[in-house]
Amino acid sequence: MRFVIQRVNHAKCTIDGNITGSIEKGLCVLIGVAESDTKEIADKMIKKLVNMRIFADENDKTNLSINDVDGRLILISQFTLYANCKKGNRPSFVEAGSPDMANELYEYCISECEKAVSGVQRGVFGADMKIELENDGPFTIVLDSDKL
């Protein structure tokens, strides 16, 4: 499983001009699911995400978590995080989870994040989404379950 975590001042997801999720200060998280991922792996990733200290404290040191700053989450599914570009110029996505399995784990991530953080917003799995955000920093972290 891969999360691309971006600290944002605000972010929103729209589909066909309709806003499906919008947050102010918080994290925009792109979620990629591999075929080998499980709920146990998702639990480890979510625990790391929720407890990651990437917001500045009063001394401007990254020492505060999303809950410490009353921040929000917007979770966006993105199978392209598992693009393999080793051969040729067209990415392969064979390492990405099948749509049914990936959607199940994406929904699980949303459900578990809602238990841990107030103000969780979302995109729509498999939809053609437009993501608009303002990075804060920028501060971006790629979290890969293979490296936890």
Where are these regions (language model features)?
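Residue-level signal for inorganic ion chemistry
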Residues: 45, 76, 139
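Short glycine-enriched loops at secondary-structure junctions
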Residues: 9, 73, 78-81
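Divalent-metal-activated hydrolytic enzyme cores
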Residues: 115-129, 134
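Short beta-strand segments
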Residues: 6, 32, 77, 132, ...
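Short, low-complexity, polybasic intrinsically disordered segments
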Residues: 94-96, 136-148
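Compact, glycine-rich, soluble single-domain proteins
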Residues: 19-70, 83-111, 115, 121
